[in-house]
Amino acid sequence: MTETNFDFLAQGDPAIAAIIGRELQRQQEHLELIASENFASPAVMAAQGSVLTNKYAEGLPSKRYYGGCEFVDQAEELAIERAKELFGAAHANVQPHSGAQANFAVFLTLLQPGDTFLGMDLSHGGHLTHGSPVNVSGKWFNAGHYGVNRETERLDYDAIRELALQHRPKLIICGYSAYPRTIDFAKFREIADEVGAYLLADMAHIAGLVAAGLHPSPIPHCDVVTTTTHKTLRGPRGGLILTRDAELGKKLDKSVFPGTQGGPLEHVIAAKAVAFGEALRPEFKTYSAQVIANAQALARQLQARGLKIVSDGTDNHLLLVDLRSIGMTGKVADLLVSDVNITANKNTVPFDPESPFVTSGIRLGTAAMTTRGFKEAEFAIVADIIADRLLNPEDSSMEDSCRRRVLELCQRFPLYPHLSPATPVAV
């Protein structure tokens, strides 16, 4: 949002303007370590806040149910072509409102109610839409689950194969929300072929790394690939479906509209196009490589301070801290770091004895603060701040020191310096 938009908003709705101003200040003065968050560019935000929000456009480009779509058609076509180029896909649907919507459209295309599919257990790093009993994927379908090896805390492909042979699923899902290691999509393809299953990769967390060529691509191996467009892709919040099979792509299109959605959000689709264009530039690969280097630096320094990292490290943008060794829950750790302006999230760890509302771990990600310019040296400092806070939870002077160091880092690497509330905002 530009200053001009702030001015309009301050005049039209001072209450909302004040709330947004406070949120801006929160983002500027906090270390954002939630692995699923990032900071979109001003260009992405400008597209999303444009006049395209006014246009209804049910259908696909050149096949709309409304008139006046010639320019939103151009924007959506550009988003489609950029997505295909970015990921090497034959077909792209840019209309899903979210990753969850994208996944549901795939289920509608490939499965019937009661069919069996196989996905990772949520407590091991899977996602709600991969068969959790509280999600439609777990209510309408027969969901089987695999996990990680207890000793290595990594995927055990032999065990996954055995489960696939046992369940004979119609669909296998790979791609996760809290798995810090490289995924062998080719191995999953072998398993899927052996049992005659479709293979879906949900690469929501690693899409930016895949786009940059820093994680193996699922496109050559999977029947369908879904992703969000924020996270490591650094775009607007939304979803995307990709496939190398153009004919399957036509069926997926029908499952998005009219199957699961009505009108697409053309202002968001334009913002997706901007983000895809940014990701096609050479500097995006440099950024993505720094994201991984920063995550590894963060993990190393946390380990040096005596904290346990699930799977003993990371290959991507996220890591899980297992807090059982220091006798702390994820819920408590989340609150402790929040007190010193660090935003993270409690998270289950493999074979976690605690409930999802308590957990034994916290999940940390480096994508957002890398966008702000952090490198390995800064993330080593971040690791020390986190360790100081978690290892000294009752020390008020240490709490003050941690908060001060966080604010110093934030001031060194400003976020959206061109943005400021139109009117003073009390915090």
Swiss-Prot record:
GO terms for cellular component: cytosol. This is Serine hydroxymethyltransferase. The modification N6-(pyridoxal phosphate)lysine is found at K231. Transmembrane segments: none annotated. The record marks H230 as: Plays an important role in substrate specificity. Catalyzes the reversible interconversion of serine and glycine with tetrahydrofolate (THF) serving as the one-carbon carrier. This reaction serves as the major source of one-carbon groups required for the biosynthesis of purines, thymidylate, methionine, and other important biomolecules. Also exhibits THF-independent aldolase activity toward beta-hydroxyamino acids, producing glycine and aldehydes, via a retro-aldol mechanism. Pathway: One-carbon metabolism; tetrahydrofolate interconversion; Amino-acid biosynthesis; glycine biosynthesis; glycine from L-serine: step 1/1. HAMAP family: SHMT (MF_00051). (6S)-5,6,7,8-tetrahydrofolate binds at L122, G126, H127, L128, S355, P356, F357. It comes from Synechococcus elongatus (strain ATCC 33912 / PCC 7942 / FACHB-805). Homodimer. It is found in: Cytoplasm. The keyword Magnesium does not apply.
